[in-house]
């Protein structure tokens, strides 16, 4: 019985791969044009109304700026219990770069500097 189930799943996978659209069908001239996507990419890169790093993004959490490679993330936290704003339990959010992305960016920059010079 197990062999029959495995054979059925395998044949279904093979059939679906054979009948799927090929890359030529998907990237044909009529279905995909690079001119359609370029304005969206340009708009994201030139976004001037973004929130700078370590600035408040509480009201608009998707407004953080980009660094050289990655977009900063709006990180939220509650202030310490000693401060007056903590008594109001107000959440504060700032645009920050996650540490792993910071290390990746620095490592790639050092590799690029090493390769070029």
From Swiss-Prot:
The presence of a 'disulfide through disulfide knot' structurally defines this protein as a knottin. The modification Threonine amide is found at residue 116. It is found in: Secreted; Target cell membrane. The keyword Disulfide bond applies. Its main location: secreted. This is Neurotoxic enhancer CSTX-13. GO terms for molecular function: toxin activity. Keywords: Amidation, Cytolysis, Disulfide bond, Membrane, Neurotoxin, Secreted, Signal, Target cell membrane, Target membrane, Toxin. It comes from Cupiennius salei (American wandering spider). One of its GO terms (biological process) is killing of cells of another organism. Belongs to the neurotoxin 19 (CSTX) family. 12 subfamily. One of its GO terms (cellular component) is other organism cell membrane. Disulfide bonds join 50-65, 57-74, 64-95, 76-93. Heterodimer of A and B chains; disulfide-linked. Interacts with CSTX-1 (AC P81694) (Kd=430 nM), and with CSTX-9 (AC P58604) (Kd=370 nM). It comes from the Eukaryota. The keyword Protein biosynthesis does not apply. It holds the Pfam family Toxin_35. Negative results: does not show effect on 18 ion channels: Kv1.1, Kv1.2, Kv1.3, Kv1.4, Kv1.5, Kv1.6, Kv2.1, Kv3.1, Kv4.2, Kv4.3, Shaker IR, hERG, Nav1.2, Nav1.4, Nav1.5, Nav1.6, DmNaV1, and Cav3.3 (when tested at 500 nM on channels expressed in oocytes). Expressed by the venom gland. Residues 1-20 form the signal peptide. InterPro entries: Spider_toxin_CSTX_knottin, Spider_toxin_CSTX_Knottin_CS. Residues 21-47, 82-87 form a propeptide. Synergistic toxin that induces or increases a cytolytic effect when combined with CSTX-1 (AC P81694) or CSTX-9 (AC P58604). When alone, has a weak insecticidal activity, with an unknown molecular target.
